[in-house]
Every structure is written in structure tokens, then in C-alpha cells.
């Protein structure tokens, strides 16, 4: 008579999480796409990422390869990414992406401030003086008047651009 196994190979308290094969494939494809994004970066930017030496070398190789060799190398990078923690890599990538959008948002803010200076005059210049106390109030007033005249006459917006350059210079100093 056969004896029944009294004890299971795992502890009953342990919860076993079964992952489907397609879910595993999706995870691997995500890692491969993350690797593709790394390949698209410049080497100077890539040096700032927390990558293992093998992965760094594989990414550098993929940047040199063309067509089919590149595709195979991207698969290799995906495989190497399985042994890496993707969170810090993804965080660094997000930081680089947001850097561009933050710079664009800052320029839009300066453009809006410039428009206010031209349209509202002294009231907006007072706001600029609060933001940038070292700004030359008289120069800003003069440029605002000139920009309004240029706009009215349909001339090129030389003063308009100069106001923006002044505001941009003060923003970069901060």
C-alpha cells in the first residue's frame, strides 16, 4: 500500500502567485522597450544611468549595430534587463523626459510675462520688478512702449524679442 505524502513541498502559509506565460512575455517586452529607449540616448547621458557593466556595454554595442544585428542585440538587452532593477532606470529616463517639458514650460511662462509687459505696461513691470529686483525698470518701460509702437505700425518685433531676452537672462541667473 502506497503511503500518502503528509507534508506539501511548500508551507501552507506561503501564497503561491502563478504568472501566466503571456504576462511574463509582456513584462519581458516592456523591459526590451526600456532597453530600446536606452539605446536611443547619447553616451554622455547614458553615463548618468545606474546600469551594470554588461548592460552598459550591450547598449553601446547596439548603438553601433544596424538592422538584424541591432534587433538581436535589443533582445539581448531585454534579457540583461531581467537581472536589473528597472525602477531606477525608469526614474532616470522619466527625469530626462521631464527636463525638456520643464524647460518648455519655463519658456512659455516667460513669453506670457513678456506679453503682459507689452499689453499692461507699468502694472506688469511692477510684477517683473518683484520677481527680478535687479531688473532695469526704465529699460523695460522703454522697450514695452517701443514694442507697442512696433506692433501698431506692423514693424518687426525687435523690442518684443529684446524684452524676452532680458527676462530669460534674469531667469537663468536665478
From Swiss-Prot:
Q: Spell out the molecular function terms from Gene Ontology.
A: ribosome binding; rRNA binding
Q: Which Pfam families match?
A: DarP
CC annotations in GO:
cytosol
CDD domains named in the record = YjgA-like
> In which compartments does the protein localize?
Cytoplasm
Its keywords, alphabetically, are: Cytoplasm, Ribosome biogenesis, RNA-binding, rRNA-binding
Gene3D superfamilies listed in its UniProt record: PSPTO4464-like domains (1.10.60.30)
What the entry lists under InterPro entries is as follows: DarP, DarP_sf
What biological-process terms (Gene Ontology) are attached?
assembly of large subunit precursor of preribosome
Q: Which domain of life is it from?
A: Bacteria
What function does this protein fulfil? Member of a network of 50S ribosomal subunit biogenesis factors which assembles along the 30S-50S interface, preventing incorrect 23S rRNA structures from forming. Promotes peptidyl transferase center (PTC) maturation.
Q: Per the similarity annotation, which family is this? A: Belongs to the DarP family.
What protein am I looking at? Dual-action ribosomal maturation protein DarP
State the organism of origin: Vibrio campbellii (strain ATCC BAA-1116)
Amino acid at each position: 500500500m502506497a503511503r500518502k505524502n503528509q507534508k506539501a513541498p511548500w508551507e501552507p502559509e506561503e501564497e503561491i502567485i502563478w504568472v501566466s506565460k503571456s504576462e511574463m512575455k509582456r513584462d519581458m517586452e516592456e523591459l526590451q522597450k526600456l532597453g530600446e529607449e536606452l539605446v536611443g540616448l547619447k553616451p554622455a547621458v547614458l553615463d548618468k544611468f545606474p546600469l551594470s557593466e554588461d548592460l552598459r556595454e550591450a547598449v553601446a554595442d547596439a548603438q553601433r549595430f544596424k538592422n538584424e544585428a541591432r534587433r538581436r542585440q535589443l533582445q539581448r538587452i531585454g534579457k540583461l534587463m531581467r537581472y536589473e532593477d528597472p525602477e531606477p532606470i525608469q526614474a532616470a529616463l522619466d527625469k530626462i523626459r521631464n527636463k525638456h517639458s520643464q524647460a518648455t514650460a519655463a519658456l512659455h511662462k516667460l513669453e506670457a510675462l513678456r506679453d503682459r509687459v507689452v499689453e499692461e505696461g507699468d502694472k506688469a513691470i511692477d510684477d517683473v520688478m518683484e520677481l527680478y529686483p535687479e531688473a532695469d525698470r526704465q529699460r523695460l518701460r522703454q522697450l514695452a512702449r517701443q514694442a507697442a509702437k512696433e506692433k501698431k505700425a506692423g514693424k518687426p518685433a525687435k523690442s518684443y524679442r529684446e524684452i524676452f531676452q532680458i527676462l530669460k537672462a534674469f531667469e537663468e541667473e536665478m
